[in-house]
């Protein structure tokens, strides 16, 4: 068939409305886009250069005042330049600077520049990964990246996956597919066995999926926070004896607080012996796949499903999650058909419609930023960055040991360090001082630290995901903790 393509080309027209605010093929919208991007880039670069602290210190009430004074929908628009100045500037000035070396509160990483460049392409092209005709090249990018990831995880040729909004969605999808595999009674009589230190999204996902309130069984952990294999074996036998259905065993490769990696090989053996779906939540520890420490994830290759989050250890902008399946055929329960989207009779022969592997319909082309990062930095570069963060973490733990006012909870597993402030006025008072110290350091823009509870006591937690969080930075933070905590002790009565 001969089609006159030229007849369908839109001739250039003079804009008489606001259409130049919508990126299109015309020269005016391209000019507007370029100017806006350059202004935004300059603002980010200028603010990064000016960021001497990781937070402005403005109170919640102060920020509320800034935003409450803004009319979000004026009758007449201000234009992009003014909007960027009015909104973009305070958004940058009062952001938490995740790239600051003293930002150590959460699994919230600084971002790789290649990924930021990819974000511009992703947003500007606005591809949607539900059907091939909405994302021709982006679909193939995701397929190629997933093939690379399944190889890194040492899964068989039958494996595949899909990109998700993050670990919670990946975990929920895995539990849903495991439940479907077990039949119609799975959610009524089924159980999910996981570590006592597993991410809360496992319990949350089970509740959303309609499992019974007591369906998630927390297996005891050893002193290092790893799931106890004997305890898991005993629970599997007990569940079978009660006539309940073991839907899945969920192992964790990198718990949120301790960074513990469950014994994956032994858990895989138990799951296989009982024909139970094994899911590995490697949202945190999965970054080791890109480093010389891949062997620490031995047993991952036996999983039915794997959660990965690249906005944790792999320096990706939020969000960037992945679910890998050992057998792509297990995605079948998600393969709904719609005549307008992915009809039974394929319009584009052999072209995949990735909606058939996802809980989402409309979905961003997030695989592009991973591909851009891997290509630009390479295997050796990613290994160096990850290893540097691990080295910094071990140095931080050693630094904690040298201070008599701090007590290290234990050696780090990945990139978290837990420790307590020690007070002569007792552990309860130390708990209160720890919480106040955390807030004081953040409000002063000195450091972003987390607190968590371990063995019933409040601990400081450092999460080192930035290669620039060097021992010198950590020493200054630990000194600031001591100075601030002692000052707070002198000004506060016993709780």
UniProtKB/Swiss-Prot annotation:
Specify the domain of life of the species encoding this protein.
Bacteria
CDD domains xref list? DOPA_deC_like
- Cofactor requirements of the protein: pyridoxal 5'-phosphate
Q: Which cysteine pairs are covalently linked by disulfides here? A: none
Keywords annotated in UniProt: Decarboxylase, Lyase, Plasmid, Pyridoxal phosphate
Its GO biological process annotations read: rhizobactin 1021 biosynthetic process
User: What name does the UniProt record give this protein?
Assistant: L-2,4-diaminobutyrate decarboxylase
InterPro entries to which the protein is assigned, alphabetical? PyrdxlP-dep_de-COase, PyrdxlP-dep_Trfase, PyrdxlP-dep_Trfase_major, PyrdxlP-dep_Trfase_small, Pyridoxal-P_BS
Q: One MF term from GO for this chain?
A: pyridoxal phosphate binding
GO CC annotations on file: cytoplasm
Q: Tell me which PANTHER family the record gives.
A: CYSTEINE SULFINIC ACID DECARBOXYLASE (PTHR45677:SF8), GLUTAMATE DECARBOXYLASE-RELATED (PTHR45677)
What EC number(s) are associated with this protein in UniProt?
Answer: 4.1.1.86
Q: Where are the N6-(pyridoxal phosphate)lysine modifications?
A: 312
Question: Which pathway is this protein engaged in?
Answer: Siderophore biosynthesis; rhizobactin biosynthesis
Question: What gene name is listed for this protein?
Answer: rhbB
Which family is this sequence assigned to? Belongs to the group II decarboxylase family.
């Amino acid at each position: 068939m001969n089609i006159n393509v030229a007849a369908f080309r839109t001739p250039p027209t003079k804009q008489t409305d606001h259409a130049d605010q919508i990126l299109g093929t015309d020269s005016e919208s391209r000019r507007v886009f370029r100017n806006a991007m350059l202004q935004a880039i300059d603002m980010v670069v200028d603010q990064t250069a000016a960021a001497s602290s990781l937070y402005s210190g403005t109170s919640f009430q102060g920020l509320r005042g800034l935003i409450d004074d803004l009319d979000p929908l004026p009758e007449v628009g201000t234009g992009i330049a003014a909007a960027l100045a009015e909104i973009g500037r305070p958004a940058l000035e009062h952001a938490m600077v995740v790239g600051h070396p003293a930002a150590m509160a959460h699994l919230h990483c600084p971002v790789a520049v290649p990924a930021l460049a990819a974000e511009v392409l992703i947003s500007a092209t606005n591809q949607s990964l539900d059907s091939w005709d909405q994302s021709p090249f982006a679909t193939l990018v995701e397929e190629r990246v997933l093939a690379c990831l399944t190889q890194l995880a040492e899964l068989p040729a039958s494996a595949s996956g899909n990109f998700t909004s993050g670990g919670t969605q990946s975990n929920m999808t895995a539990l849903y597919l495991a439940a479907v595999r077990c039949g119609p009674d799975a959610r009524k009589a089924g159980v999910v066995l996981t570590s006592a230190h597993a991410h809360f999204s496992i319990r949350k996902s089970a509740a959303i999926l309609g499992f019974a309130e007591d369906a998630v069984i927390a297996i005891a952990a050893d002193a290092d926070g790893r799931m106890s294999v004997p305890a898991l074996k005993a629970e599997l036998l007990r569940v079978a004896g009660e006539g309940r259905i073991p839907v899945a065993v969920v192992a964790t490769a990198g718990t949120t607080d301790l960074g513990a990696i469950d014994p994956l090989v032994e858990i895989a053996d138990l799951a296989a012996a009982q024909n139970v779906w094994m899911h590995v939540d490697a949202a945190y520890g999965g970054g080791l796949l890109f480093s010389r420490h891949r062997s620490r994830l031995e047993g991952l290759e036996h999983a039915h499903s794997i959660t990965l989050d690249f906005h944790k250890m792999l320096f990706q902008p939020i969000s960037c999650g992945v679910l890998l399946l050992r057998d792509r055929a297990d995605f079948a329960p998600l393969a709904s058909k719609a005549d307008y989207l992915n009809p039974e009779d394929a319009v584009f022969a052999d072209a995949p419609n990735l909606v058939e592997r996802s809980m989402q319909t409309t979905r961003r082309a997030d695989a592009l930023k991973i591909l851009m990062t891997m290509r630009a930095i390479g295997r050796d570069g990613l290994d160096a960055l990850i290893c540097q963060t691990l080295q910094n973490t071990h140095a931080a733990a050693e630094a904690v040991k040298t201070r008599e006012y701090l007590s290290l909870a234990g050696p780090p597993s990945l990139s978290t360090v837990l420790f307590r402030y020690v007070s002569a006025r007792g552990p309860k008072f130390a708990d209160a001082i720890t919480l106040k110290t955390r807030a004081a350091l953040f409000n002063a823009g000195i450091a972003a630290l987390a607190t968590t509870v371990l063995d019933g006591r409040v601990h400081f937690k450092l999460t080192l995901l930035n290669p620039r969080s060097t021992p010198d930075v950590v020493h200054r933070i630990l000194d600031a903790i001591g100075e601030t905590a002692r000052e707070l002790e002198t000004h506060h009565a016993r709780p």
